[in-house]
Amino acid sequence: MAGKDWEIVQEKAFTAWVNSVLDKRGEKISDVGKDLSDGVKLIFFLELISSKKFNKKYDFEPKARINMIQNVALALKFLDEELKIKVQGIGSEDFVDNNKKMILGFLWTLYRKYRIAVISEGDKSSEEGLLLWCKNTTTGYDGVNITSFTKSFRDGLAFLALSHKFEPESFKFQEFEAMDPIARLNAAFDFAEKGLGVPKLLEAEEVMRGTTDERSLVLYTSLFFHAYRAKEEKARLESSKNEMANRLAGLENSLESEKVSREQLIKQKDQLNSLLASLESEGAEREKRLRELEAKLDETLKNLELEKLARMELEARLAKTEKDRAILELKLAEAIDEKSKLEQQIEATRIRGAAEAQGLGLLRKNLDTHVHDLLKWQKLTMENSSSSSIDDQIIVEVSGLPFGEQVKHLATKLEAENLAIMKLLNQKEDDLKAQKLKSSKSKK
């Protein structure tokens, strides 16, 4: 069997197996290469086949690739640490990237663990136990002697015997003994599918030629084993149900022949009815409770996820608030620094103004003194002038001016007066010289 044909066989078988497990949670898949890629249904599947709870938090509706990889990684870690199953060579990316070959190998490992390793017959288990079970089940059928998976099923008689063993009324085995192997194989596959619900996974021509992969034969025959076990379990339940019904009918028929109190008979009937109803509803009630618990768990997990998102949003807001506060504190520090600089500038301006005012006052005092000195000179040198009128005139001239203009005006006035004094002194010296000269001439 070519590698591609083996993949097709596995895909059909594993899709049916995974769906039979996921049905307990109301889930299903259509493509094992794609529908397990986000890790959610993979986690459901591992929980159900192992009957162990997956306690890690994971993303129920992953959208981004990284979230899918994280989900699958958690599932593989659960498989390794909790279920103690080592699966070599497969990683999270193989599921996310839909690596069908690796995924089928992964499912084959789980199938061997949970569907083949549990098979036991006599002192044999797993594949050997399955082969022995096939041999014991077909004992007594003409032409059937099962010793290996690769050789004993090629003529179709072994598969036909397995189908006939549990559905003997559906066909007569002897009618197919004279057919060619391919016809027998196709007939056996059809009877198995219709009577036992075993899907048709193999090609009759390949089985007849002996090119079918041994794993495919092991996988296909294991479906017969589990179909028989399921049918036997169903038969046991039916037998128990019929036994209870017969006991109930027997009690009802004995009402007339036996002297049993009406109350006791009613009590026994109610007990049997209750027991019968309990047997009939046990499976449904268990499934109902499981679904309710799973629904509550899903709701709790969703609420936890919402709380997580709300907490993350609150933390983001808090971080933004802290950032804004830091910015405000920085601006406040800058404002305080600017205020300090302005206060220093104001103080420097005040000190400089006070110094300038003190200097201007001293200058004005000196100018006033100088003006009075000038007035005294004027009184000495100007015969027809009045000191009070000159003083008043200067005061009138500067009284309406600003302080700076007053200083400037007084300085100009002072300079002019100095020039006039110098001129007057020169004139007086000339007059004295002339008088002395005249006096000396008169003496001669």
Curated annotation (Swiss-Prot):
Its job: Actin-bundling protein. When linked to F-actin the actin filaments form preferentially anti-parallel bundles that associate into meshworks. Plays a major role in cytokinesis. Negatively regulates cortical localization of rapgap1.
Alphabetical list of PROSITE patterns matching this protein: ACTININ_1 (PS00019), CH (PS50021)
Entries under CDD domains matching the protein: CH_CTX_rpt1, CH_CTX_rpt2
Region feature (Actin-binding): 1-227
Segments forming domain Calponin-homology (CH): 8-115, 124-229
Protein name from the UniProt record: Cortexillin-1
Subcellular location, record wording: Cytoplasm, Cytoskeleton
Pfam families tied to this protein: CH, Cortex-I_coil
Keywords recorded for this protein, A-Z: Actin-binding, Coiled coil, Cytoplasm, Cytoskeleton, Repeat
InterPro entries from the UniProt entry: Actinin_actin-bd_CS, CH_dom, CH_dom_sf, Cortexillin-I_coiled-coil
